[in-house]
């Protein structure tokens, strides 16, 4: 009985591992793996202060924290919720924009601008709180989902008036205040506002040019072709049809809200 149960568990784990490595897009897998690895390391080493976002780290010129703070978490609950958010929300976004563009966006303006807003708030409030966690990314993705960037996800919800969907996106971070009533609300709200502006195609200048992305993918095609579940610019354009990176321009979000 125990042997049979062990075999079933082993088969299930093997199936989940295969699904994880072969079905989920590359950037999503990398972020999830880094989150898991750093979560384990955090049990034994105090890495939150080194990777977390704080005014103290900025003064000490630890600029890497502008990019690393989503990958570490304070506790088990935030760790689990962060992973859940990544698996539920990130894959569709990556398929829509491609792996390279997704990396550029989530380690670029979608992450850095909210981080800067948080640091300014910390300076004004004379706070040295350390912010870690993937909450900013999750709220960004939720806002873009609500604003029809992914119109086939929840058609009933997306039939609501646009103003209502914008209000829902802005209210989402506020609902988390009872769990964490702190200055982090500034980062979360900034992430939502930036995502709303991006959804209306007013931040196209932050997107890497499609021609450059194609050049990079062509230059390193031998390496890229060997990487499982890498989403190329061409595949992203095909997936979204007339979405954020049109085939004829490969660098524009001109369609805005689908």
Curated annotation (Swiss-Prot):
It is found in: Golgi apparatus membrane. The chain crosses the membrane at residues 24-44, 70-90, 100-120, 130-150, 157-177, 181-201. Keywords: Golgi apparatus, Hydrolase, Membrane, Protease, Serine protease, Transmembrane, Transmembrane helix. Gene3D superfamilies: Rhomboid-like. It is a multi-pass membrane protein. The keyword Ligase does not apply. The active site is at residue 188. Disulfide bonds: none annotated. GO terms for biological process: proteolysis. GO terms for molecular function: serine-type endopeptidase activity. Its EC number is 3.4.21.-. The keyword Transmembrane helix applies. GO terms for cellular component: COPI-coated vesicle; Golgi apparatus; Golgi membrane. Belongs to the peptidase S54 family. This is Uncharacterized rhomboid protein C19B12.06c.
């Amino acid at each position: 009985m125990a042997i049979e149960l062990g075999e079933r568990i082993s088969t299930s784990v093997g199936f989940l591992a295969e699904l994880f490595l072969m079905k989920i897009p590359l950037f999503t897998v990398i972020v999830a793996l880094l989150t898991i690895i750093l979560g384990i390391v955090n049990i034994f080493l105090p890495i939150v202060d080194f990777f977390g976002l704080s005014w103290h780290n900025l003064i000490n010129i630890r600029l890497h924290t502008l990019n690393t703070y989503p990958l570490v978490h304070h506790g088990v609950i935030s760790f689990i919720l962060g992973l859940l958010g990544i698996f539920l929300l990130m894959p569709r976004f990556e398929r829509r924009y491609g792996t390279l563009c997704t990396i550029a966006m989530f380690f670029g303006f979608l992450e850095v601008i909210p981080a800067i807003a948080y640091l300014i708030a910390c300076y004004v409030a004379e706070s040295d709180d350390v912010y870690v966690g993937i909450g900013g990314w999750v709220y960004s993705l939720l806002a873009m989902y609500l604003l029809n960037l992914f119109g086939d996800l929840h058609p009933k919800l997306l039939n609501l008036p646009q103003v209502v969907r914008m209000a829902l996106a802005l209210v989402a971070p506020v609902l988390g205040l009872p769990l964490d009533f702190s200055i982090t609300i500034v980062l979360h709200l900034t992430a939502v506002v930036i995502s709303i502006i991006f959804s209306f195609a007013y931040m196209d200048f932050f997107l890497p040019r499609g021609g450059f992305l194609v050049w990079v993918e062509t230059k390193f095609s031998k390496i890229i072709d060997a990487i499982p579940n890498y989403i190329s610019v061409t595949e992203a354009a095909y997936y979204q049809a007339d979405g954020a990176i049109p085939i004829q321009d490969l660098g524009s979000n001109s369609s805005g809200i689908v």
